[in-house]
């Protein structure tokens, strides 16, 4: 008899949980975007030129532009068009520079910091209150100053680009 009660109690518990959960509605988008796809179907990107006042590293411009377009193509069903998209992104890389971060007892730099800043203008034709102009997005990475920048530059720039692209995505379509 105890065995049947035990199973009956478990069955009742599962039934109550199933009814309770079916009454709940949880909505979560795994891509993080909050776009109304009935109004927004296309996106256009202008090339973000490298107008840095600091260093100029040739591959950075194309790396950034590719990463920016990729995040929207991978995380939204938006169609990329050459111009006049429902969403429009334009801007420029305004800063890319290295700075001494820490000095050792011998007076030489021990840590250096690489910084990158991008200025972005965003237009949402279906929801103009989300537009912004000349908003700055930045990222930085530290590295051991005993290393040559050329030895760590590719990895650090990729990390900074990922950070900045995520910031832009969140500011434009994720509404965090």
What are these regions (language model features)?
Residues 1-24:
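Sec-dependent bacterial lipoprotein signal peptides
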Residues 153-176:
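Compositionally biased, intrinsically disordered linkers/stalks adjacent to structured regions
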Residues 56, 60, 110, 152, ...:
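Conserved acidic
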Residues 31, 74-79, 83-132, 136-151, ...:
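Surface-exposed short loop/turn segments
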Residues 3, 22-66, 70, 170-176:
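A structural "domain/chain start" motif
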């Amino acid at each position: 008899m105890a065995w049947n009660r035990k199973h009956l109690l478990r069955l009742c518990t599962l039934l109550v949980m199933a009814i309770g959960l079916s009454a709940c509605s949880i909505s979560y988008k795994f891509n993080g975007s909050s776009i109304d796809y009935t109004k927004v179907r296309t996106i256009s990107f202008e090339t973000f030129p490298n107008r840095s006042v600091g260093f100029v590293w040739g591959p950075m411009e194309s790396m950034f532009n590719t990463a920016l377009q990729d995040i929207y193509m991978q995380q939204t069903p938006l169609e990329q068009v050459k111009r006049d998209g429902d969403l429009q992104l334009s801007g420029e890389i305004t800063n890319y520079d290295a700075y001494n971060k820490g000095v050792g007892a011998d007076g030489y730099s021990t840590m250096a910091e690489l910084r990158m800043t991008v200025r972005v203008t965003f237009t949402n034709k279906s929801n103009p209150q989300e537009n912004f102009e000349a908003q700055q997005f930045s990222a930085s990475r530290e590295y051991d100053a005993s290393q040559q920048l050329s030895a760590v530059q590719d990895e650090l720039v990729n990390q900074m680009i990922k950070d900045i692209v995520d910031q832009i995505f969140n500011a434009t379509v994720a509404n965090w």
